[in-house]
Amino acid sequence: MKNNQPADAISFIVDVLKKEQVIAYPTEAVFGVGCDPDSETAVKRLLELKQRPMEKGLILIAANFDQLKPYIDDAALTAEQREAVFARWPGPVTFVFPAKPSTPRWLTGRFDSLAVRVTNHPQVIALCEAFGKPLVSTSANLSGLEPCRTAQEVLAQFGDDFPVLHGATGGRQNPSEIRDALTGELFRQG
């Protein structure tokens, strides 16, 4: 891509995603790298790029809750648990839901659950809406390096040809908080 954003950046990035490639995009705090969650090829590319074991599981980021329903067992939550989740969404809080049995292991890793987030970042909302589904979302950084906070940092770490949706992060200093949707237990402070 040579660091020049095409006129229709979202369409360009969606085309890259449809080719089972990994992309970078701004999130609430840092840039993320992501791909099509339904493509084992794309997810394996992302895991290889990040040097991340599949067993750890991944996060999905979505424009709305409906995009997450194919992957999570929403029926496992009580009305009160669902209300607690929706009180924090959209926003920078990731919740771990029970996964549907059909959710691929390349997303859940060794778990029977899946971490998911409904974002309030306008570019990520537009991207997920244009793509028609959520994205895998993990911080944009190579193993041992700090997460990227700008498109320029992404290109410096991943190379000038890496497909990046240019834009600003949401300005948060910390990555998303992670909580259990069933118990409310805090796994990672945001």
From Swiss-Prot:
GO terms for cellular component: cytoplasm. Its main location: cytoplasm. The keyword tRNA processing applies. Keywords: ATP-binding, Cytoplasm, Nucleotide-binding, Nucleotidyltransferase, Transferase, tRNA processing. It is found in: Cytoplasm. One of its GO terms (molecular function) is ATP binding. GO terms for biological process: regulation of translational fidelity; tRNA threonylcarbamoyladenosine modification. It catalyses: L-threonine + hydrogencarbonate + ATP = L-threonylcarbamoyladenylate + diphosphate + H2O. It comes from the Bacteria. Pfam families: Sua5_yciO_yrdC. Its EC number is 2.7.7.87. Gene3D superfamilies: DHBP synthase (3.90.870.10). SUPFAM superfamilies: YrdC/RibB. It is an enzyme of class 2 (transferase). Residues 7-190 form the YrdC-like domain. InterPro entries: DHBP_synth_RibB-like_a/b_dom, Sua5-like_dom, TC-AMP_synthase, TC-AMP_synthase_SUA5. Belongs to the SUA5 family. TsaC subfamily. Required for the formation of a threonylcarbamoyl group on adenosine at position 37 (t(6)A37) in tRNAs that read codons beginning with adenine. Catalyzes the conversion of L-threonine, HCO(3)(-)/CO(2) and ATP to give threonylcarbamoyl-AMP (TC-AMP) as the acyladenylate intermediate, with the release of diphosphate. This is Threonylcarbamoyl-AMP synthase. It comes from Cronobacter sakazakii (strain ATCC BAA-894) (Enterobacter sakazakii). The gene is tsaC.
